[in-house]
From Swiss-Prot:
It comes from the Bacteria. Belongs to the UPF0677 family. NCBIfam families: mthyl_TIGR00027. The keyword S-adenosyl-L-methionine applies. The lineage of its organism: Bacteria, Bacillati, Actinomycetota, Actinomycetes, Mycobacteriales. S-adenosyl-L-methionine binds at D129, D158, L159. GO terms for biological process: methylation. InterPro entries: Ppm1/Ppm2/Tcmp, SAM-dependent_MTases_sf, SAM_mthyl_Trfase_ML2640-like. Transmembrane segments: none annotated. The keyword Transcription regulation does not apply. Keywords: Methyltransferase, S-adenosyl-L-methionine, Transferase. It is an enzyme of class 2 (transferase). This is Putative S-adenosyl-L-methionine-dependent methyltransferase MAV_4435. PANTHER family: S-ADENOSYL-L-METHIONINE-DEPENDENT METHYLTRANSFERASE YKTD-RELATED, S-ADENOSYL-L-METHIONINE-DEPENDENT METHYLTRANSFERASES SUPERFAMILY PROTEIN.
Length: 303
């Protein structure tokens, strides 16, 4: 599966299929013995997409060809997504607790935070994603009779287009502090689009705005290509018959911490392995191909 600069997708193809994969992992993580997240919408959304493998996965019908290694890979993927999800959940709830009432979820996919988090009165949540993705989730959540816990405003646009203008046209207030998330997103953008994304966020952000994202410090073209293949191979061992390789854009990328710092953000960064410890999950130190072992969780505040 090869990316192009102007490609598009729904939730059953290309980058969209990875959103369905992540939702499936959230569904599994929500039903574990000691779950650190709770996403009751993940499994119904995955079933609605209709990709057979992920439907069978959330329904407990997948048996890896290599049970020992496949089950371990699946647990790793599930735990990794659980930790990532909890980090961003805590980010948004913390920002809301501190008085921020405007939030933007970039590349929202099947994210259900607007429905499942405990938002305060007056909170407005913007979800930005491809038109087909937004339409599908909006219709599916309505069919599930789900009600947002905040005022939800969807913005149907590709992040490689003029999404800031689309956001403002949907009521975004540049004078209000905002909490922003770019979760599981950067590797799917060309390097120059990553920089442009942060430039746009900065331009739209009032002082006191916050941002959460994640990045790979050694994200060179070769490394990203190798990791994309490892990512695909792990899911193949679990039994996935969908080609997830070739989805990451190659090329030298800016260091996210340095880039944001240079634009006025106060940045803190923590390796994902530290988050595993925070949330009481075991990090697989002996696994050389653990999912993005050097991934760094970033939180920042402007001004």
């Amino acid at each position: 599966m090869t990316r192009t600069d102007q490609d598009s997708w729904d939730l059953a193809s290309s980058v969209g299929a990875t959103a369905t994969m992540v939702a499936a992992a959230r569904a599994l993580a929500s039903t574990g013995e000691r779950p650190i997240i709770n996403d009751p919408f993940a499994a119904p959304l995955v079933r609605a997409v209709g990709l057979d493998f992920f439907r069978r996965l959330v329904d407990g019908e997948v048996a890896p060809a290599d049970p020992q290694r496949g089950e371990r890979d699946l647990q790793l993927e599930t735990d990794s997504i659980a930790v990532r999800t909890r980090f961003f959940d805590d980010f948004f709830t913390g920002a809301a607790r501190d008085g921020i009432r405007q939030s933007v979820i970039l590349a929202a996919g099947l994210d259900a935070r607007a429905y499942r988090l405990d938002w305060p009165a007056g909170a407005v949540v913007y979800e930005v994603d491809q038109p087909k993705v937004v339409e599908f989730k909006t219709n599916t959540m309505a069919a599930l009779d789900a009600r947002p816990a905040a005022q939800l405003r969807t913005v149907s646009i590709d992040l490689r287009e003029d999404w800031p203008e689309a956001l403002r046209a949907n009521g975004f207030d540049v004078t209000q502090a905002t909490s922003w998330s770019a979760e599981g997103l950067l590797m799917y953008l060309p390097p120059e689009a990553q920089d442009r994304l942060f430039d746009n966020i900065t331009a739209l952000s009032a002082p006191g705005s916050r941002l959460a994202t994640e990045y790979h410090p050694d994200a060179t073209g070769t490394t990203m290509a190798q990791r994309a293949q490892e990512f695909n191979d792990r899911w193949a061992r679990v039994g996935c018959d969908i080609d997830l390789s070739g989805l990451f854009f190659d090329g030298e990328r800016s260091n996210v911490v340095e880039y944001l710092t240079g634009r006025g953000w106060r940045v803190s960064a923590r390796p994902r392995r530290d988050l595993f410890d925070d949330y009481g999950l075991a990090y697989p130190e002996d696994d050389e191909t653990a999912q993005f072992p050097n991934i760094v969780a970033v939180s920042a505040e402007l001004g």
